């Protein structure tokens, strides 16, 4: 899939453990989309996208210091400067939580996601000649993916329900 890169074991298990200890202390809130509450919990840094009211972008708290080393690792993986990432979304997926088909909002550019703890199935689809073309990727613990170009703009993605606790740390550039 053009514009998609996947890297297993981007970080060491000890770094994952340290991150998870910090993530557990974040002020998560239930994800809400047009009155629907998802099973996942989220917290945004740098910028926050509000789905209510037609979708608005607001300045959010600065990216926490404990995420800066991971931001640098994610930037290196994506072959860009760390400061290119202006938005971070941390998502907590409890057992049974997933996310439906979507594309990240147009205000965001390139995307790097880092997966912690439980593995998940990251699904992609796009309509080609009236048929859905599909790709599934098993995102293991400590892995990362990068979406740019067609993978970012032409393909939708979703995550099947997870069996155990999973954290996703999504770094995004701004357009």
Task: Go through the PLM ranges and name each one.
Residues 1-175:
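Non-heme Fe(II) oxygenase metal-center motifs and adjacent flexible, charged/small-residue loops
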């Amino acid at each position: 899939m053009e514009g998609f890169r996947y890297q297993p074991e981007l970080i060491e298990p000890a770094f994952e453990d340290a991150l998870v200890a910090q993530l557990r202390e974040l002020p998560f809130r239930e994800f809400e989309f047009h009155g629907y509450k998802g099973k996942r919990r989220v917290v945004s840094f740098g910028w926050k996208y509000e789905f209510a009211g037609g979708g608005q972008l607001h300045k959010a708290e600065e990216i926490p210091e404990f995420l800066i080393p991971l931001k640098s690792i994610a930037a290196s993986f994506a072959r860009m400067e760390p400061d290119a990432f202006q938005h971070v979304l941390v998502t907590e997926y409890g057992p049974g939580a997933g996310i439906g088909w979507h594309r990240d909002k147009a205000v965001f550019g390139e995307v790097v996601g880092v997966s912690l703890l439980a593995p998940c199935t990251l699904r992609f689809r796009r309509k080609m000649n009236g048929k859905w073309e599909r790709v599934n990727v098993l995102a293991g613990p400590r892995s990362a993916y990068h979406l740019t170009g067609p993978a970012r703009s032409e393909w939708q993605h979703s995550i099947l329900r997870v069996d155990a606790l999973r954290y996703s740390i999504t770094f995004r550039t701004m357009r």
